[in-house]
């Protein structure tokens, strides 16, 4: 089953006949595979690890699948070139110029850019967002509540440098000052949000192997290692830009941790002495409530004897019931009018 934006691309796939195609920021469907009906080859770069896992079982000599903030093994002077680059307009609008610059770096001269997105997702502002080295974006299709724009690479794009897309700032935490590196598209208030502040203000003393689930830009990781530098910390997220941000944050603070993608806890191994998180489930939708349930269930199985589990969550979400059902007991060490802190120690 193809998503609505992917269906719009299929409606317009004739322009890809025998093209070497790159798909950026694709969704959790098999659109890149479907394009092989007309394209000579397709490379797909997912920025969401779940989307990558959905597609990668179908990889073959004509379909290469990647996860990350950029294509791997590229010569910065001569990156690999494509006849067409397809960009799925990102939900985080500040990420769009990054994706357009990345696309331009991988297009042949006068190569085709296709940008698709849902009407409600900000794509209507595409013409203003396209850099000057692209021709003016032309609307090619309007269907399935989506828009498809086309353009061509007319000029020369600046070389991709990750440092051009990072904002670095100092953050005061209960553990002291830390430097945060935030890439475009990664959530940041440039101050300590209320939930994380509640978590860090009541940080337990941990030991051994600790997991930071949904690490984002690495705020919790850096604060944790500042206070408890002896920890063997692992940081996981599903978002490529978040993982790259976390690595930059740790480096800026002279800290080390294992940073890697994981869909839930599926890519973690073994048991942990501690699991800490401000989990990214804040919208109360059924889908995210199910992800939250899976996180609680899976993390309960991966706690060592005497292991500590502590998360902060919006108080209106049904965490109390989920945690009580899984752990059999529930401690709330602190709360405010918006957030609750949940704590459990494995016996």
From Swiss-Prot:
It is found in: Cytoplasm. InterPro entries: DNA_methylase_N6_adenine_CS, Mtase_sm_N, rRNA_ssu_MeTfrase_C, RsmC/RlmG, SAM-dependent_MTases_sf, Small_mtfrase_dom. Its main location: cytoplasm. Pfam families: MTS, MTS_N. PANTHER family: RIBOSOMAL RNA SMALL SUBUNIT METHYLTRANSFERASE C (PTHR47816:SF4). Specifically methylates the guanine in position 1207 of 16S rRNA in the 30S particle. This is Ribosomal RNA small subunit methyltransferase C. It comes from Shewanella sp. (strain W3-18-1). The gene is rsmC.
């Amino acid at each position: 089953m193809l998503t609505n934006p992917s269906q719009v691309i299929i409606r317009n796939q004739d322009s890809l006949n025998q093209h070497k195609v790159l798909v950026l920021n694709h969704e959790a469907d098999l659109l890149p595979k479907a394009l092989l009906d007309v394209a000579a080859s397709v490379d797909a770069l997912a920025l969401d690890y779940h989307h990558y896992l959905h597609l990668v079982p179908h990889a073959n000599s004509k379909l290469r699948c990647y996860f990350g903030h950029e294509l791997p093994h590229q010569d910065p002077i001569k990156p690999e070139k494509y006849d067409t680059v397809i960009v799925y307009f990102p939900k985080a609008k500040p990420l769009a110029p990054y994706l357009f610059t990345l696309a331009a770096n991988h297009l042949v001269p006068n190569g085709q850019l296709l940008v698709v997105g849902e009407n409600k997702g900000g794509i209507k502002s595409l013409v203003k967002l396209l850099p000057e080295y692209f021709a003016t974006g032309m609307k090619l299709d309007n269907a399935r509540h989506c828009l498809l724009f086309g353009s061509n690479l007319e000029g020369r794009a600046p070389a991709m440098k990750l440092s051009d897309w990072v904002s670095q700032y100092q953050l005061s935490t209960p553990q002291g000052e830390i430097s945060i590196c935030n890439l475009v598209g990664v959530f940041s208030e440039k101050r300590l949000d209320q939930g994380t502040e509640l978590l860090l203000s009541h940080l337990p003393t941990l030991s051994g192997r600790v997991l930071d689930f949904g690490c984002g830009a690495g705020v919790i990781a850096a604060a944790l290692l500042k206070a408890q530098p002896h920890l063997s910390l692992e940081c996981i997220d599903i978002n490529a830009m978040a993982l790259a941000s976390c690595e930059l944050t740790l480096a800026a603070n002279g800290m080390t941790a294992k940073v890697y993608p994981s869909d839930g806890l599926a890519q973690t191994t073994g048991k942990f002495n501690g699991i800490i998180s401000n989990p990214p489930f804040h919208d109360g939708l059924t889908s995210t409530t199910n992800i939250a349930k899976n996180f609680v269930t899976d993390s309960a199985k991966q706690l060592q004897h005497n292991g500590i589990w502590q998360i902060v969550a919006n108080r209106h979400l049904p965490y109390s019931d989920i945690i009580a059902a899984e752990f059999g007991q529930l401690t709330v060490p602190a709360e405010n009018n918006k957030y609750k802190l949940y704590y459990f120690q494995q016996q």
